[in-house]
Amino acid sequence: MYLTLQEWNARQRRPRSLETVRRWVRECRIFPPPVKDGREYLFHESAVKVDLNRPVTGGLLKRIRNGKKAKS
């Protein structure tokens, strides 16, 4: 099921201004990304904001960076 930008924002724990949410969409901070339908964005009901400032520290990424010594 898809929600409009206003409906998706209203369901968030801390709703933000519509312009802020539109900026997040342009900066690809929403996953899965919303679909633009005419003049409005449609969000999947399970879409979430992704924090791009948080470093990605997965096990595979550590092994790629450090080689076999990081595998545990």
From Swiss-Prot:
Q: Which UniProt keywords apply?
A: DNA recombination, DNA-binding, Viral genome excision
Kindly list any coiled-coil regions of this protein.
none
Q: Which GO terms describe its biological process?
A: DNA recombination; provirus excision
InterPro entries the record matches = DNA-bd_dom_put_sf (IPR009061), Excisionase-like (IPR012884), Excisionase-like_sf (IPR038137)
A Gene Ontology molecular function term for this protein is:
identical protein binding
Assembly and partners? Answer: Interacts (via C-terminus) with the integrase (via N-terminus). Part of the excision complex made of the integrase tetramer, IHF, Fis and Xis.
Name the job this protein performs: Part of the excision complex necessary for the excision of prophage from the host genome by site-specific recombination at the att site.
Put simply, this protein is called Excisionase
Source organism: Escherichia phage lambda
- What taxonomic lineage is listed for the species of origin? Viruses, Duplodnaviria, Heunggongvirae, Uroviricota, Caudoviricetes
Tell me the gene name: xis
